[in-house]
Every structure is written in C-alpha cells, then in structure tokens.
Curated annotation (Swiss-Prot):
Homotrimer. GO terms for cellular component: cytoplasm; membrane. Its main location: cytoplasm. The gene is glmU. Keywords: Acyltransferase, Cell shape, Cell wall biogenesis/degradation, Cytoplasm, Magnesium, Metal-binding, Multifunctional enzyme, Nucleotidyltransferase, Peptidoglycan synthesis, Repeat, Transferase. It comes from Brucella melitensis biotype 2 (strain ATCC 23457). Its EC number is 2.7.7.23, 2.3.1.157. Binds 1 Mg(2+) ion per subunit. This is Bifunctional protein GlmU. The lineage of its organism: Bacteria, Pseudomonadati, Pseudomonadota, Alphaproteobacteria, Hyphomicrobiales. It is an enzyme of class 2 (transferase).
Length: 454
C-alpha cells in the first residue's frame, strides 16, 4: 500500500461558537499542540500524503499552524457553510489532481490515531471503494447509525430518522472516511441538499455509493479516536485522554512515574528508559530527558535537554535552551535558560543561570545570578571547568571565569577572572563594637516619644 498516493482533506472551517473564543476552534491546544496539528500528524503517520486544508475563520493562522509541522499545504476556503460534503468539495481542485486514496478527517478530532486511519487505507488497498470509520459508544443515543447488510455498509441513518429497530444498533458513525480517489468527485457531486437545512451531507455518499454497486464497508476504532471538541469541557476531557495515553506509553517503555496522574507531557516530549519522574512535574514543548535522569517534584521543563543521570529539582525551572550534560544537577528554586551545564556541574539551590556556559564539575553556590540583560541586549557568562562560585554572587555579563577559579561569596564580578585565580568583588566589612546598644536605645526613645504625643 505504501506506493498508493493519498490526499488527506482536513476539514477545519467550523465556526466553533461553543468554544466562546476569539481563537479558531482548531487552534485550541491539547498537549501544547493545536487540535488540527494532531490530526495532520495522524494523517502523516499513514505514509506519504498530501494535505488539503479546508479553512474558514482565521484561515491564515490555521494554515500557518499546520505548515509549521507539515510544510507547505494546499488551503481552500469554504466561504459558505452548506454542510460537510460542500466543505469537502471546497478542495475540488486538489481532488481533481487524481489520487489513489482520499482521507476525509476533521480538524477538531485530536485523538485520532494513525493506526486507525491506516486501517481504513488498507481496506481501500484490499478492494473497498469507500470506508467509514465507526465506533461503539456506551450509549449510541444521538449518533448516526451504520446500517450494514451482508457485510456491506448500505447507509448512515441519523438518530431522528432512525426506526426503533435501527436505534438498537450500537455501531455509530465516527464521521471520518476513506474513499478511492477515482470515485470521489462523482460521489460528492451526486450529494443533494433535499433536507430541512438545505445542506449537503457527506454521510449521503454511503447510500449513493451502495446504489452504484460500489464496495462500501466500515471499520471499528476505539471511541476516543473520534471524539470531537466543541467546548472547553470537551477540550479538557481530550487533554486527560491524551495525557493518560502518553503516561502509559512511557511507563511501558521503561519510565517510572511515581504518581502518573500528576505529571503532564507535551506532544513532543521524549523520555528515555530508566528515567524517574516524581509527582507534580510539567513538561512543555521540546524536552528530551536521557536515560537515568531523576526529575524531582514540582519542576517545570520547556525546550530543555537533560543528560544521562542528571538530577533536576525539586522546584526547578528549565527554560528553552537549557542543555544539561551527564550527571549535572539543577536543584531547588533554580532557573536555567539558554545555558549549557557541563558534566557533573552543580547548581544546587536558589540560582538564576541565563545565557551561560558552565564547565564540567563546577559548583555554583546558592543565590548566584548571571546578570545577562541590560534592558536592550543579552550577554554571555562563561565559567570554566572545576570553578567554584561562592554563594550570593552576581556575575555581570559579558564575563568569563577561568578553569579552577574561585569567586568569594557575596561578590559582584564585572571583569574576567583568570584560571586558578581568587576574585573578591565586595566592600570590606567594618565592625563597630557597642554601636548596636546605642542604636537600640536611640530608636526606643524615638518610639516612646511618638507614643506620648498620641
């Protein structure tokens, strides 16, 4: 089947009014990725496929989001909302190019899996002309029923038109379809609008195809594959399902999640085997954690690379560009952004490291700050191998600290420090004996005078 050409038509023109949002519905996110992009990723998982995007409100934004993950796509605007078949025909120009297979999917079904779409395409390769993706919900009420006779799908009957006997059928229409390209335009053009709403319904092509003697069939997929998102509650439900899938996938691959339900991943999170993740950890986009790493509770990672046997947290934040080498450590209440942390280096507590390079085995004391921004530009801090930065030090970039250098606690470092040097950048302490007693007596007298005056 791999040599069969395919066009995937992604219907993404819905108004999404129930989302009550200025953002187009298909651009709302699950696991950090727009709904429509989840669908496109599933389509791409079936093999090589061109994508035709049918858009409406926010057309350019929708197209841009898809092209970020899929490269250039054809976009077609549905100027009037006259039904699902009408929406598909908005992509007539693309359909007419001639493809072996057509996939018709909805941009608001982010949980559809590539294997479900692949199963539909495989049916086409085996001789089917039209394949409808169906499912069996706990209660079929409200769904269109798939009517089968002799192993063939003969019609889709909506709930309000179904007989009492047909309403007993538990096999329901999931809305997604695959059809042989050579029949596509003829079937779509045969759909009429003789119904109460005067719309062109995609479901009608089943009866039309059956009437033409074509091979029409249905396949069953898990219920969650065809869940459509219409409001924020359903969006949250989809997020829950996606996260549970990801958690199970990772645990089965050798990752330990101590409290799985409290850990949240993004669409592209990569966690290698033998990583241990404690409760209440959040992964934003573009995070890769190598084998043997330990992520403590209440850590937040985004755009970060974590090396083998590294240790993060608790209460650590890794921002985009954080690159931690093997056995390095970023501890509690530390933030690392756009910085390379060398092998075995330690940033144990209460530090901000931004736009920096930390050498191997260096130790960054509590309260260390890389002062990287002057209000206009970012500057770099470079710390060599085996350096020691004393607590409560401020490193004012651009600045370079050499190998084995030692920075005294409380220093403000504004100039480069050579290798093996000791740098002190603070005012000398002055101690005045007995002065504290004098100050206490003075302030007590002032306070007493104020009380009398009241």
């Amino acid at each position: 089947m791999t040599d069969r050409t395919c066009l995937s038509i992604v219907l993404a023109a819905g108004e999404g009014t129930r989302m009550k949002s200025n953002l187009p519905k298909v651009l709302h996110r699950v696991a950090g990725l727009p709904l429509v992009c989840h669908v496109v990723n599933a389509v791409r998982g079936t093999g090589k496929s061109d994508v035709a995007l049918v858009v409406g409100r926010g057309a350019e934004d929708v197209r841009s989001a898809v092209e970020k993950i899929a490269g250039p796509v054809s976009a077609f605007e549905q100027k009037e909302r006259l039904g699902t078949a009408h929406a598909v025909l908005a992509a007539r120009e693309a359909i007419a190019r001639g493809y072996d297979d057509l996939l018709i999917v909805f941009g608001d079904t982010p949980l559809i899996e590539a294997q479900s779409l692949l199963a539909a395409r495989e049916r086409l390769a085996q001789g089917a002309d039209l394949v409808v993706i169906g499912f069996r919900p706990a209660s079929p009420h409200g769904y269109g029923r798939l009517i089968e006779e002799g192993g063939q799908l003969v019609a889709i009957i909506e709930e309000k038109e179904a007989t009492d006997e047909q309403k007993k059928i538990g096999f329901c229409n999931g809305g997604l379809m695959a059809l042989r390209g050579q029949h596509a335009l003829a079937l779509l053009d045969a759909v009429g609008n003789d119904n109460a709403k005067g719309e062109y319904y995609l479901t009608d092509i089943v009866a039309i195809a059956h009437g033409k003697g074509l091979n029409v069939t249905a396949i069953e997929v898990p219920v969650d594959n065809v869940i459509g998102i219409n409001n924020r509650a359903e969006l949250a439900e989809a997020e829950t399902i996606w996260q549970n899938r990801k958690r199970r996938e990772l645990m089965l691959s050798g990752v330990t999640l101590i409290a799985p339900e409290t850990v949240f991943f993004s669409y592209d999170t990569v966690i290698e085997p033998d990583v241990v993740i404690e409760p209440n950890v959040f992964f934003g986009p573009s995070v890769h954690v190598a084998s043997g790493a330990l992520i403590h509770s209440f850590s937040h990672l985004e755009g970060a690379q974590v090396g083998e046997k590294a240790e993060i947290g608790p209460f650590a934040r890794l921002r985009p560009g954080a690159d931690l080498a093997e056995k390095s450590k970023v501890g509690n209440f530390c933030e690392v952004k756009n910085a390379k942390v060398g092998k075995g280096a330690k940033i144990n507590h209460l530090a901000y490291i931004g736009d920096a390079v930390i050498g191997a085995s260096s130790n960054i004391g509590a309260g260390t700050i890389t002062c990287n921004y002057d209000g206009y530009n970012k500057f770099k801090t470079i710390i060599g191998d085996n350096a020691f930065i004393g607590s409560n030090s401020s490193l004012v970039a651009p600045v370079e600290i050499g190998d084995n250098a030692y920075i005294a606690s409380g220093s403000v470092i504004t100039a480069d420090v050579p290798a093996d040097a000791l740098a002190l950048g603070r005012a000398r302490q002055e101690t005045k004996e007995g002065r504290a007693k004098i100050l206490r007596e003075k302030y007590a007298a002032i306070k007493a005078a104020k009380s009398v005056s009241k």
